[in-house]
Amino acid sequence: MKTASIHFWSTLVLLFSCIGSVIAYSSTDLTTMYDWNQIIKPLEWGQMNFIHTTDTHGWLNGHLRDARYKADFGEFKSFVLRMKELADFKDVDLLLVDTGDLHDGNGLSDASDPEGIYTNNIFTYLPYDILTIGNHELYQASVSNNTHEYFVPHWNGTYLASNVQIFNSSNELEQFAAESAYFTTKHGVRVLAVGFLYDFTGNANNTVVTPVETAVNSRWYQQQINRTDVDLFLLLGHIPVRDWDEWKSLHASIRKVHPDTPIQIFGGHSHIRDFAVYDESSVSLEGGRYCETVGWLSIDGLAASNATRQYVGRPVTNETRQSYPNLPIPNTPLYYTRRYIDFNRQNFRFHTQQSEDSFDTPEGIELSKIIKQYRDDLNLSYVFGCVPKNYYMTEVSPQSDDSIFKLMTDRVLPEIITNRNRSTVPRIIISNGGGIRGSMYQGKFGPDEMFQLNPFLTNYYMYLADVPYKYAKKLYSTLNGGSNLRNINENLAALNPGYVTSDDFGEDGDDTVHTSVPSYATPNILQAQAGFNATSSPETIDVVFLNFLQSIVLKALNNMANDTLYTSSNVTQYWVRDDGYDSSPYSFAYFVQQEWSDNCD
């Protein structure tokens, strides 16, 4: 493992220590109440079984204040090893797969330099059979270089990046990781695996992402799918499993050559639990996000497997297909089951049939110790302040006093995002709702919470000076599409709040029965104002915005004026701090320090 630099985080901790004393907080931390008597549905094992993780985004130490998802990756390792033991006992196959986005979202992954060093190393302690890349491995050149140089080699060809290349130290383009992998399972199933990223265009300039449709027509891919020694095609991709053309193209390219060979798909990126049908011998699974979910899928009826038929699951019947029309129909339908496992110790114990005393493995215990040591190394126990109540991301209306978006527009943006040389100039501050990735919960607020709320260290607040107000006042309505209420269900109040999943096989996929949580759409655009009130009309104002939004802000203003008033040459950074900690996530840390540093008992 490459030694991580934690200089920047240690410096920030020192900075805050100078602003105000380091805060000690009670060890009786707030946690979500959870009823362990909830009914947990058992898993059904087929001849071939899969455990799936995706979009972990650094949450490998678990959700420390939410008992529903509190298991760390050490406990997950014990779960995997116990499940491997069960698979051997049942004499069936079990594969462990992951579909990318290993960081951006938690202090454990984001407080190192480059990001992801610690979490990548934790991943190497798990016996993954196949992994693939996500878009968050490519935003920063330092991250993609480190992943390519140190993380990929550990997997000996089982980490896949079928449509991603990288410029090496000689400035020559080479494959980021293996294009494909071929192996035979314990029970004789010959598997060809590929791993694709969706048609991503936001990568740093040291990498190249080939569109899936182009890759499908490439020589190497055509050679692989025309092999005759394949019993199952395993398609991994950082691509949502529903309504995405990338999967349809990949599925069709194989089905046209192999009308009857099973195709198993695992997706990611959209952060949901989902299961979608492609045809009678091809289904797909997406296992959630943030170490909240472990995906489970079993296949039975595989003629190529020498494992005993388990007679579980159900066949594909009249479900709507995600595939392109007019493809060959397989004549060997398979039987499938799926589950979405809550990421906690109780559920892991239940599914491995272990007691509290027998569940942990020595390897899992050791990994939990390593995770704790990494947290200590990164100073993740530091506290900026203690939040007095919950501020929610999606559980309440964005206009509610309990909304993180209202806190942001009413307080954080106008009070923290300032410029000492233009503090008296009226301004609007524009941010994007998608930059907020979680809620702010009552209790201590430290590095973990900061990155969980907003992990985007490359987002800075820029501005255009002295923009005519007649144009600036129209920006919000031009850029923002609004939000809509969805998924309200208040009729199951006796159950724990959590995931209530509906997919192509129905509503019985969650391993634990929950009551649905109200969910409001995230606003596209957030806007705050400072230096003037709603009834005044200054002639000109400063327009402050995230660099992420620069192109659409410039385009909108120029369209309103029917002229090219502004180009990138007119844009400069607005929020600038002498210490350099002035990207968007730090706005919350400074606000909590300013408002609630004396709020911890």
From Swiss-Prot:
Signal peptide positions (record): 1-24
Subcellular location: Cytoplasm; Nucleus
A single cellular component GO annotation: nucleus
Gene Ontology biological-process entries: adenosine metabolic process; nucleobase-containing compound catabolic process; nucleotide catabolic process
Gene Ontology molecular function: any one: 5'-nucleotidase activity
InterPro entries (UniProt xref): 5'-Nucleotdase_C_sf, 5_nucleotidase/apyrase, Calcineurin-like_PHP_ApaH, Metallo-depent_PP-like, Nucleosidase_C, Pesterase_C1039, YHR202W_N
Protein keywords: Cytoplasm, Nucleus, Signal
Gene3D superfamilies: 3.60.21.10, 5'-Nucleotidase, C-terminal domain
Pfam family, one: Metallophos
Keyword set includes Membrane: no
SUPFAM superfamilies: 5'-nucleotidase (syn. UDP-sugar hydrolase), C-terminal domain (SSF55816), Metallo-dependent phosphatases (SSF56300)
This protein's name: Uncharacterized protein PB2B2.06c
Source organism (scientific name): Schizosaccharomyces pombe (strain 972 / ATCC 24843) (Fission yeast)
